Amino acid sequence: MEEVREGHALGGGMEADGPASLQELPPSPRSPSPPPSPPPLPSPPSLPSPAAPEAPELPEPAQPSEAHARQLLLEEWGPLSGGLELPQRLTWKLLLLRRPLYRNLLRSPNPEGINIYEPAPPTGPTQRPLETLGNFRGWYIRTEKLQQNQSWTVKQQCVDLLAEGLWEELLDDEQPAITVMDWFEDSRLDACVYELHVWLLAADRRTVIAQHHVAPRTSGRGPPGRWVQVSHVFRHYGPGVRFIHFLHKAKNRMEPGGLRRTRVTDSSVSVQLRE
């Protein structure tokens, strides 16, 4: 696996992990269009199941008290700033259930079930639509045509931080770190086979508070099919962040047998009070 540590992000109010030799993209328009909601997937028909013997009823586990839930979370998160209180709509028990910090907020982060600890499994050209190759629920997918039989597969989704269990005072006063990570296949289909674009948006989902764009070029060394990691941490981005718009592109090439793809896996967006 090859790790790409990039850091020169576009947009003010951010610090990056460190330097790296990557090709940066020009700034995007200030108001990127949020992805439309994907159509709901139809529910599969229910099949009658054979009668099963009744299992003995087990007692439900005891729910933690509000004080115990607070203690458990603060042990996990670390101390908060003095005076930071929960809004009335949230309780510590609800936060313990949602766990909005230190977890991946993206839906279907590994749609094709690929293991990054092994080389990308060999695959040939295919004529099957991408949506039939895995579970892409939560992603909005489109194709961007290029020249010379090439194209981008563009996948994006928008994370609602308040809906995930975070709250305004935490985001504005603490400004926890927001970490974005992704893995792409070194497919050798072109010099640049992957792009990452992330916007931190205000409540209107149009005002850009901070952004990061990167188009890495791999070294070309080693066997093809290895996984390359891209990551970035947003810090000190300023108050008002309510949404995270995550978008990545993977390059394809049309061949006689169909489309040969660059695969992406283990995409993640997470929020941390400490790293």
From Swiss-Prot:
Residues 1-67 are annotated as: Disordered. One of its GO terms (biological process) is positive regulation of cell population proliferation. Expressed in the esophagus, oral cavity, skin, tongue and reproductive organs. It is found in: Cytoplasm. Transmembrane segments: none annotated. Residues 95-273 form the FBA domain. The modification Phosphoserine is found at S31, S37, S49. SMART domains: FBA. Promotes cell proliferation. This is F-box only protein 50. It comes from Homo sapiens (Human).
